[in-house]
Amino acid sequence: MASTSSFDIVSDFDRQELVNAIDQAEREIKARYDLKDSNTSLELGEDTITINTSSQFSLDAVHTVLQTKAAKRNLSLKIFDFGKVESASGNRVRQEVKLQKGISQENAKKITKLIKDEFKKVQSSIQGDAVRVSAKSKDELQAVMQRLKAEDFPMPLQFTNYR
């Protein structure tokens, strides 16, 4: 009797690394000459980051700094979903950045369809905000991982619980 192997596909990020990236971004913003007087603030909520700054120019610079610091901390830039820019009081601009965590049902269906179309001996099932993939051969599972890494999904994918 051959046992089956499996792994889970999830979309997650390390919150502590995000906190560190935001902290480093705030330090750089306070030290940079072009952003020193912009009175910029980055506020981390449960699943959002609020950027409050003086102008569109400084908002673009904050985007660059935040993305650079996140990339250096090994965070995928796909976790950031930049919302629309709103005007705030006192000629300031504000932007909400949603943090993407978990795989939506729509994207989970795309992943399972891709797996079922290309790998006949592999089973996949949606379990909440994760996708469980199982097969008899570990080589097939590794082929699935390589195929999913090659595909460009709108969220970062991690492979966990490899058994």
UniProtKB/Swiss-Prot annotation:
Organism: Trichodesmium erythraeum (strain IMS101)
Classification via PANTHER family: UPF0234 PROTEIN YAJQ
CDD domains, sorted: YajQ_like (cd11740)
UniProt keywords, alphabetically: Nucleotide-binding
Family that this chain belongs to: Belongs to the YajQ family.
Name of this chain's protein: Nucleotide-binding protein Tery_2743
GO terms for MF: nucleotide binding
Function in brief: Nucleotide-binding protein.
One annotated Gene Ontology cellular component of this protein: cytosol
Pfam families: DUF520 (PF04461)
NCBIfam families named in the record: PRK05412.1
